[in-house]
Amino acid sequence: MLYSPKKLFLFFLSCIVLYVNSNNSGFVTAANSIGLNYGLLGDNLPSPSNVINLYKSIGISRIRIFDPNTEVLNALRGHRDIEVTVGVKDQDLAALAASEEAVKGWFAANIESYLADVNITFITVGNEVIPGPIGPQVLPVMQSLTNLVKSRNLPISISTVVAMSNLEQSYPPSAGMFTSQAREQLVPVLKLLSQTSTPILVNIYPYFAYASDPANIRLDYASFNTKSIVVQDGSLGYSNMFDAIFDAFVWAMEKEGVKNLPMVVSETGWPSAGNGNFTTPAIASTYNRNFVKHIASGKGTPKRPNKSMNGFLFATFNENQKPAGTEQNFGLYNPSDMKPIYKLF
């Protein structure tokens, strides 16, 4: 998550499959396809083996890690019922973009030894680096990795993770369009993905929109807590901001000739502290619970009705080595005792 105030202002001015059941207490019970992000930027995190046991105990079958961490991947050995998305570090992109041999070396060093007993289903090339100075490095690395896994007939999808800063305009959703830099860097990636219908991974955070303009954005609209139509866009009505942001990205892709490309929600969530009354456990719980119920309904979005979405909630733990404030408080669990900050599962 990298959101500058300027980008947020411009973006919002212009404007998993998760299957769940609610038990009698109102808590959410995860079924087999919900995903969680597993970040490691903390000095008080539990051991990876304990984290994997936590995932198993709450029915988590998909996780996303931001780099090929050996401790985590070793802890996942034998747990092939958990699908793993592994990220390529941003700082590795320059060397990997230089040659296909470098990519083969990276794969051999970081992925090869885990293929037999870890269920690696996605490799993501860079995290929110498009648009940006190293954005052009994403496409050649994706091409090399795609060629590699295809040549070996490996069931691993290659993609990248992008933020909504790629949108120059997002309101109303049908006006969604990419920035000029995104058109230069992202559209070739989207066209590569469309050749095999491989999803693009997107980070969607209604929280940042609400926090940047609470006077004009309703909390219930941002947190999935109203069924009333808040934004009418032609024949399409929006009762939550998540759908509006998602569909703005869909519209932007279509304007570049990329249609029907799947999208995976690589991150979404709401911080439970760090920004006063905007970030409480109650609001965070409301957003995440309502998000899961919304996705589980199978309704899709107004632009893509009745189409399921895969996704990952952000994040498993509060991470005390991230920037102070909200960034440290997106976790569902306290790392020191692994107790929930609020009950979700």
Swiss-Prot record:
What keywords would UniProt list here? Answer: Glycoprotein, Glycosidase, Hydrolase, Plant defense, Secreted, Signal
The protein's recorded glycosylation sites are 23, 119, 277, 306
GO CC annotations, alphabetized = extracellular region
**Catalytic residue positions:** 128 (proton donor), 267 (nucleophile)
- Where on the tree of life does the source sit, at the highest rank? Eukaryota
Under the heading PROSITE patterns, the entry gives: GLYCOSYL_HYDROL_F17
Signal peptide feature range: 1-22
Matching InterPro entries: Glyco_hydro_17, Glyco_hydro_17_plant, Glycoside_hydrolase_SF
Q: Which reaction does it catalyse?
A: Hydrolysis of (1->3)-beta-D-glucosidic linkages in (1->3)-beta-D-glucans
Which residues fall in a coiled-coil region?
A: none
Short name of any one Pfam family annotated for the protein: Glyco_hydro_17
Identify the main location: secreted
GO MF annotation, one: glucan endo-1,3-beta-D-glucosidase activity
Please give the SUPFAM superfamilies that the UniProt record associates with this protein.
(Trans)glycosidases
GO BP terms: namely: carbohydrate metabolic process; defense response
What sort of enzyme, by top EC class, is this?
Answer: hydrolase
Q: What is its EC number?
A: 3.2.1.39
Q: Which Gene3D superfamilies match?
A: Glycosidases
Subcellular location field: Secreted
Q: Which family is this sequence assigned to?
A: Belongs to the glycosyl hydrolase 17 family.
The record describes the protein's role as: May play a role in plant defense against pathogens.
Name the UniProt record assigns to this protein: Probable glucan endo-1,3-beta-glucosidase BG4
Organism of origin is Arabidopsis thaliana (Mouse-ear cress)
Lineage start: Eukaryota, Viridiplantae, Streptophyta, Embryophyta, Tracheophyta
**Underlying gene:** BG4
